Amino acid sequence: MSTGSSDRKDDVKLLELLNSIDEQFLVPYKKPEDLRKISSTTKLQGSTPTKELDKLASVLKAHCTKIGIVCKPGTFDNNHKVVITEIQNFSRPLFYLLSLFPLFYNNKDCPKYFTDQLDESTLQLLDGLRDFIAELQERLKNDENASLDKERLTSVGKIFNACDSLSNCSKAGPYGILANILKDNVAIMDDTMNEIKEWLEEPDFSANSDDIFLDFEDSESESDSQKEEFDQEKVYENIKLFFDGFTRKIKLIKLLVSTFRKTLVSKDFTPKRNQAETLDSIHTYLKEIQLLLDEVVSTVQFEPKNFTNEEVKEEQAALVAVTKKVLIQMSKLYEGDPKRKKWIDTWEIKFNELF
């Protein structure tokens, strides 16, 4: 805590500034629904919301770096005037950042998964700012337990990383963000196929739904807990036959997703405007497909002794239905692109042959 008269005035000014930021940015905005309530009449001349987002993320990141420097241990106590200036410089672009959001929310080219990512990154930034403000408020009140971290302000690092995420949103755009999501989807499909491969190499028949209830049963006799004998080799061959076929289906779906992902970031792909609803549908359906793939594999592994194809009949039917929905949406996106539409048609023929 500063001791001189001038320094004490700076302490008061800084505390007032911190309280003001708390009231302006941190109290009102704690969840995505709060951000959606922002009303703005922001009009951009000669620019776009995406370009402005990138500029503001860069400016915020630069001011965040300066704040980290002037607030580090050993520097903060003698630098309150500079700290006030840097925090003010940070709060101005933050205000403009939030005023941009209605332009994204009301834009028919911005799918929900994209604005969800914006919300997540912005709330991370505000969470970091919330921690930072709380740390400085405690420090100014001379709380004996307060500290600014031994090495650096962790909260400043959170803000810095959130600025990077916002910048990534602006650079990638809706199509690039979806491409990033699909990259993870493809990796999960690889994991699923590896899981199948590992099970076939080292089959485990110990899993059984009856095991869940064993601890609750009285052990009155050996026969009560005995399991039905089964032909392990026959069961294994049945599961192997199913898994071999199912792996081919996963590979084909992976081909669809990975090819579509490459299209999204391809320079020769020029989608029409107002495709947010189509992109959201594709995103949703592909998530459903991944869940169904995992559900089928889990069903087989959960009770392998009693497995029959009938056990996953509903899941496979649902998989076919949702995949056809994806193809319809992809075809919409490929309107005016006969080469890619033809590829979709060819893929669907092969898909129908497997199912």
Swiss-Prot record:
Coiled coil: none annotated. One of its GO terms (cellular component) is nucleus. Keywords: Cytoplasm. It is found in: Cytoplasm. Its main location: cytoplasm. It comes from the Eukaryota. InterPro entries: GCIP-like, GCIP-like_N. Pfam families: GCIP_N (PF13324). Present with 9100 molecules/cell in log phase SD medium. This is Uncharacterized protein YLR287C. It comes from Saccharomyces cerevisiae (strain ATCC 204508 / S288c).
